[in-house]
Amino acid sequence: MKPALLPWALLLLATALGPGPGPTADAQESCSMRCGALDGPCSCHPTCSGLGTCCLDFRDFCLEILPYSGSMMGGKDFVVRHFKMSSPTDASVICRFKDSIQTLGHVDSSGQVHCVSPLLYESGRIPFTVSLDNGHSFPRAGTWLAVHPNKVSMMEKSELVNETRWQYYGTANTSGNLSLTWHVKSLPTQTITIELWGYEETGMPYSQEWTAKWSYLYPLATHIPNSGSFTFTPKPAPPSYQRWRVGALRIIDSKNYAGQKDVQALWTNDHALAWHLSDDFREDPVAWARTQCQAWEELEDQLPNFLEELPDCPCTLTQARADSGRFFTDYGCDMEQGSVCTYHPGAVHCVRSVQASLRYGSGQQCCYTADGTQLLTADSSGGSTPDRGHDWGAPPFRTPPRVPSMSHWLYDVLSFYYCCLWAPDCPRYMQRRPSNDCRNYRPPRLASAFGDPHFVTFDGTNFTFNGRGEYVLLEAALTDLRVQARAQPGTMSNGTETRGTGLTAVAVQEGNSDVVEVRLANRTGGLEVLLNQEVLSFTEQSWMDLKGMFLSVAAGDRVSIMLASGAGLEVSVQGPFLSVSVLLPEKFLTHTHGLLGTLNNDPTDDFTLHSGRVLPPGTSPQELFLFGANWTVHNASSLLTYDSWFLVHNFLYQPKHDPTFEPLFPSETTLNPSLAQEAAKLCGDDHFCNFDVAATGSLSTGTATRVAHQLHQRRMQSLQPVVSCGWLAPPPNGQKEGNRYLAGSTIYFHCDNGYSLAGAETSTCQADGTWSSPTPKCQPGRSYAVLLGIIFGGLAVVAAVALVYVLLRRRKGNTHVWGAQP
């Protein structure tokens, strides 16, 4: 059932069942093989819990699990909650993921059902079903969250002690023992086996035969005590295993046979397998790596150019952090985590393009220095490098180069080891992974809604609309993007409702993507996130790969939604209401409608009604109230959730815009003198803040509105366009000073010894995006500066000698005079 039809289905369901609990389950009134269904005499949809309309066996068949997430590498044991077997010994549990991947489960002594997650080649929400009759039927269903290996907590995996040492083993001054550690409680068994698994992608690149595969290679240790640590001296692997250059270690219970798939396990991070490479590598690692670098270079030259379809990097660090719809922090170089930028020395922060490129599944990376300057590979080996395989993978995943982490390792990271870390051939790598210099970057456009509520449109118009109901913030037919919001009255300190309202829920969908809703949680006042009307938990993971979007939650009070089109939403709690910011790339120009205005660089038509009629600038607050009411949501197209009888009766059954609600208009605001004085001190000239203090009688609400408004203004400042002149090369046989290429920046040129500068010594980036002077040339011969130095140096020596001579003559004369005195 499409989410847009959910309100109608709920309406029918609520009418049939009333506000009480559902009937007793029988063969027709069961959730067996019906999870998510609304039809029938009782509901198996997630909203049924709040409405009291669930079938009585809802929890038995629509499964909740703990934990709900784990590494896509598999091996995580999880428990089915709210369901126990009465006779555990009779059960034969099989867990089936994505309709085809089966793992053996079990029932513990307390009757709880367990499953083990399988090795997957994708991240995101994975549907699974459970059979208790040895695979004859799978009536129970749930969802498992497969996570990128680097986002898994250290409690859930084994750690390579000094991981750099593992990946440099066999190179100069790196030998001896290697160690790994793990948490014993994470794998409850007496003895363990440690295995090496290798990853490869075979077949013609970008063909149907191109496949990804993890393979069991050989054991490092068998039947050893589960002590939490292991140390060994690596030996070169037999020739038959040498083709695997990247892989991971797996720790399993020794009762399992070698290489047994999909059993409870702890994995290490994937890493370069330097420690298992052949004697040829250990005897001359530089020569060996140089050969591999050249082979990679030859392969790259045969593959299609993926750089052309990548998004352009933001020009500054502030732009990169503000453009949250298209770029997100690279966990390998994060200034919020101490800027440990192993692969990008000189950078303090990197971002990656959120969405992989459509055709090749590639990814952009952009890195910045402490002063916010973009760091380019043309200037530094620490510069940002684009990726043939996006580190986070790309839907539909599973096949190269779209496998999360692993495709990136093969085509972008392992080659970096060959060319840059194990051999001094980094220019070869950088030539094929050049940084984007941001000349064509265009910042997104920003609109916001916050406070009581106040709106700032994409073209900069601001207004206040105090409607009670559900409204269209944004519609864009270009990508079928829809953003809707629910507004409800606030509460005064005496418990009465205010005549102002605020946003309490925001929902978004683009095309046939998932529907995500962010709303105020009734009990905590924090945020609650719903996916297709089901409340999500973020106790284990703060990042989720969803259909058509990515979702990130920060500290429980800010949610970022990144859509496939590059559009982005940020929803946060500010005081008693939600604050929402919407970012749209330039391609949405002339394609938007709704309360956030018509994006076309013309603020005079932002008050456009559904009919196309435009209210002129200077429209009265009363007329603007009618404009807002014109953009009400319809039941048939609502994205919002109605999972309580309060919501059903007040928003599903009632008109989407409450015509009985009397809003507060600016001309009607009055404050007692003492509160007015405090408001003036708090708000200054922020009229949004002043209005909200008057509307709610609360200084804290005014403060929240002022903060939200300031955040909008700061982000607007961060997203201001800047002019880039592009990278400027140093002269051959010379150097340049400066690596900033934005308007107003100056580059200085110098020649090597034995060369003279022909051309300007400096070049400045001009406002039109051109350099004031081209790169000069360094010609053979002494430079003019050196010649002038010699000339002036010689003159200085002559002058100094003359001065000494004069002083000595004077001293000699004085001595003669003094000697004649008594």
UniProtKB/Swiss-Prot annotation:
The chain crosses the membrane at residues 786-806. It is a single-pass type I membrane protein. Highly expressed in breast cancer, but shows a restricted expression pattern in normal tissues such as adipose, adrenal gland, kidney, lung, mammary gland, placenta, thyroid, trachea, and uterus. Also expressed in colon; down-regulated in colon cancer tissues. Keywords: Cell membrane, Disulfide bond, Glycoprotein, Membrane, Receptor, Signal, Sushi, Transmembrane, Transmembrane helix, Tumor suppressor. It comes from the Eukaryota. Residues 28-66 form the SMB domain. Coiled coil: none annotated. Pfam families: AMOP, C8-3_MUC4, Sushi, VWD. Residues 445-639 form the VWFD domain. Glycans are attached at residues 162, 177, 522. Disulfide bonds join 31-35, 31-44, 35-62, 42-44, 42-55, 48-54, 55-62, 725-765, 751-778. It is found in: Cell membrane. Residues 285-433 form the AMOP domain. Residues 28-785 are extracellular. May be a cytokine receptor for GPR15LG. May be a tumor suppressor; together with GPR15LG has a growth inhibitory effect on colon cancer cells which includes G1 cell cycle arrest. May play a role in breast tumorigenesis. This is Sushi domain-containing protein 2.
